[in-house]
Amino acid sequence: MIAAVIKYLSYKVELTIMILALLLCLLAMYNPTLQFKKSITSYMLLVDVSQSMNAEDLVVEDSPITRINYTKILLKQIIDKSDCGSFFSINIFVADNVANIIEPVEKCNNYDELMDTINKLEWRMAWKGNSRITFGIKSAAKMQDSLNFPSKILFFTDGDEAPKVNAINRVNLDDFNLGEELIFVGVGGDTPVPVKRYNSRNMYVGYWGSDIYDSLPGATGSRNSDSGKDEPDPSVASADYERYLSKLYEEYLISLSEQIKSQYI
């Protein structure tokens, strides 16, 4: 009896193997491909490189870090967590405009180039010292059109504008139509901190003074240029109470995102 059962099971196993082999042969004739669901993304990474992004008010692994360096970490994490086939462009926001550094490229084929470009992002890339975010997002919309590549815009900024928005310099955004294609990513802390100032050799020389607008034309100020890029010894605050203080202007960015129907994270 036992021998008969074993013989029967052995026959069933051999039959099953033969059927599976036949099915595999049939599948091979049609050259099948396995379809895996991938998270394919396309992002226009936009980084604020204004001087306020040199403020050191974030912490990574128990060590203080500047806003710009924290942004670099975020950029790398976003790229690393995206699948091959995802596309990224790298852009910078300066004053009232946006400049493209790398046009949209596929992640895996251009990984080293993307990482190298992120590592080199810094304040000396700026050609002006002022910061007008409302002008910047309009410029970002034009840049997105010129790149001719559908993508979401991730705008990394602390929201610290110079000059501050008021009734005189406020920009009308009624015609802005990016909506959910734009996401503000707030970078910085809630507590105001002084902003480090560097000279033309990128050496720390002190902190920005609170009088940064005094010598500028116009009642609202403009911080049109930053001589620190060209001077070995730019002026700095001489006392703690003279320092210009900066923070993450989260409420302003949230208000702005609601106004143009975009997102803030």
What are these regions (language model features)?
Residues 42-44, 251-265:
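Juxtamembrane amphipathic/hinge helix adjacent to a transmembrane helix
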Residues 57-66, 101-104, 121-129, 239-244:
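Second-shell loop/turn segments in exported
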Residues 87-120, 143-144:
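Short beta-strand-loop
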Residues 159-251:
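VWA/integrin I-like adhesion module and closely mimicked acidic/polar interface patches used
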Residues 48-50, 140-143, 149-168, 185-189, ...:
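DG-centered beta-turn motif at the end of beta-strands
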Residues 40-41, 53-87, 106-110:
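…and closely analogous acidic/polar surface helices at protein-protein or active-site interfaces
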Residues 1-45, 50-60:
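Acidic, polar low-complexity linker/tail segments
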